[in-house]
UniProtKB/Swiss-Prot annotation:
One of the protein's GO biological processes: tetrahydrobiopterin biosynthetic process
Annotated protein name in UniProt: GTP cyclohydrolase 1
Residues engaged in binding Zn(2+): 118, 121, 189
Family label: Belongs to the GTP cyclohydrolase I family.
Organism: Rhodopseudomonas palustris (strain HaA2)
Its EC number(s): 3.5.4.16
Pfam family, one: GTP_cyclohydroI
Length: 229
């Protein structure tokens, strides 16, 4: 059975705080592209040279046939894996639809698969994100929530930060009655290095508005995630 690591919830013990409020994120951190077009960056040649240096550091012969094109390939892979730095999360959520026909419950999109990289070891972590929000008059296209996850995932992250950024972006742009985000993921920095424990899953969650204030809504959100019937 997979190990499950879950955050402590307020109210789980007599000593748990019930007045805790999560720290606010700076909107400039999650609403705009992280890299601006005029921002100074190393050249591609410098990036490839850095890869070559790392290969030499581990003891490889960078002139052997199998590694001649590796620096170029690694830089090209980084361009793809970290393209989220050049994309704007707010733009993804900008287009909304007003035809809700009086719908007043939350919208849930679950099992959004993603792969990201931890900022500590630059190693992959991967899993699924589950997102719910309760709209006020307008809704966003469902694919946009998956796209939002993809943008933030394609940056160096911690799972906690990724969870908070997704919730904060939806909260800031859509102004819903509440947002709930849960992420479950496996971290290769834990499974293939260090302690080497494969199959361990990490769970993180973030609630705002009605979800934060109403434990019954949190429970319903969790139930709908787990109910596969």
């Amino acid at each position: 059975m997979d190990a499950k690591i879950k955050p402590l919830r307020a109210g789980k013990s007599a000593d748990a705080r019930t007045d805790f409020q999560p720290a606010e994120l700076d909107p400039s951190e999650f609403l705009a592209a992280a890299v601006q077009p005029d921002q100074p960056r190393p050249s591609r040649a410098e990036a490839e040279a850095a890869v070559k240096t790392l290969l030499s550091y581990i003891g490889e012969n960078t002139e052997r046939e199998g590694l001649l094109d590796t620096p170029r390939r690694v830089v090209e892979a980084y361009d793809e894996l970290f393209q989220g730095y050049h994309q704007c999360p707010a733009e993804v959520l900008d287009r909304t639809f007003g035809e809700t026909a009086g719908y007043d419950d939350f919208v849930l999109v679950r099992d959004i698969s993603f792969t990201s990289h931890c900022e500590h070891h630059v190693m992959p972590f991967y899993g699924k994100a589950h997102i719910a929000y309760t709209p006020v008059e307008r809704v966003v296209g469902l694919s946009k929530l998956a796209r939002l996850v993809e943008i933030f995932a394609r940056r160096l992250q911690t799972q906690e930060h990724l969870t908070a950024q997704i919730a904060a972006a939806i909260d800031e742009v859509l102004k819903p009655r509440g947002v709930a985000v849960m992420i479950e993921a496996e971290h290769t920095c834990m499974s293939v290095r260090g302690i080497g424990k494969q199959g361990a899953s990490t769970f993180t969650s973030r609630y705002t508005g009605m979800f934060r204030d109403n434990p019954a809504e949190q429970a319903r959100f969790m139930s709908m995630i787990r109910n596969r019937g």
